[in-house]
């Protein structure tokens, strides 16, 4: 009797959600491949390293990920402490990505540019739901292709902020003033202090003159 082929799961993003998905996939006998566009796991979280989270450690540690970490000799943080983004990276994301079996399943500097079903296009739909996925991504060496049985998008929204206008549209004049608008959470007390000192906050946006 032939052995069933191991299913491959492509996971976009190596943040806490993507790594948790990979940990659960491994526990279920699946083969996860994590594609992270940044140079290291937790790339987006590192951009808000200065922000303290609104929930303590006990609610931010995935159980499957925790099992992998404990098997690698990890010391869990105090459950009632509220971590910053930097804490989350240093005490959870980095050890999970570098010290557990997940390290062999993560591709960094891998920017996904397109996903489709193998053998299908916009005018062919019958049987589409059973066809494997084809993922195109870029890395430092050029374009690459990956086949997977399923895709999990855990890329998040940090690098894809909403526009300032209503109805999901770019506001009039927004594109022209893009260099003056901060769409995320700048570190106004640290890294970005010089840029924003003495500037004005308007309509929830930090704007430079």
Question: Which stretches of residues belong to each language-model region?
Answer:
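N-terminal Rossmann-like FAD-binding beta1-loop-alpha1 element of flavoenzymes
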Residues: 7-34, 209
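Conserved Rossmann-like nucleotide-cofactor binding loop
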Residues: 17, 40, 158
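Short glycine-/acidic-enriched loop or helix-start segments at secondary-structure transitions
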Residues: 21, 44, 117, 162-164
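Glycine-rich active-site loop/strand segments that organize a redox cofactor
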Residues: 38-91
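Glycine-rich dinucleotide-binding loop and its adjacent helix/turn
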Residues: 155-209
């Amino acid at each position: 009797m032939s052995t069933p082929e191991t299913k491959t799961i492509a996971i976009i993003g190596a943040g806490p959600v993507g790594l948790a998905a990979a940990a659960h996939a491994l526990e279920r006998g699946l083969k996860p491949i994590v594609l992270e566009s940044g140079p290291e796991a937790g790339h987006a979280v590192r951009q808000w390293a200065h922000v303290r989270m609104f929930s303590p450690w006990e609610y931010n540690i995935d159980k499957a990920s925790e099992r992998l970490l404990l098997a690698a000799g990890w010391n869990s943080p105090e459950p009632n402490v509220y971590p910053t983004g930097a804490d989350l990276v240093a005490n959870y994301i980095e050890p999970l990505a570098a010290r557990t079996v997940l390290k062999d399943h993560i591709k960094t500097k891998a920017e996904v540019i397109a996903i489709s079903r193998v053998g299908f296009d916009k005018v062919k739909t019958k049987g589409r739901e059973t066809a494997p996925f084809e993922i195109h991504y870029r890395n430092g060496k050029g374009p690459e292709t990956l086949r997977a049985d399923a895709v999990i998008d855990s890329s998040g929204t940090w690098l894809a902020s909403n526009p300032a206008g209503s109805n999901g549209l770019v506001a009039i004049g927004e594109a022209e003033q893009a260099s003056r608008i901060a769409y995320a959470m700048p570190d106004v007390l640290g890294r970005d202090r010089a840029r924003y000192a003495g500037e004005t906050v308007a309509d929830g946006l930090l704007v430079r003159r």
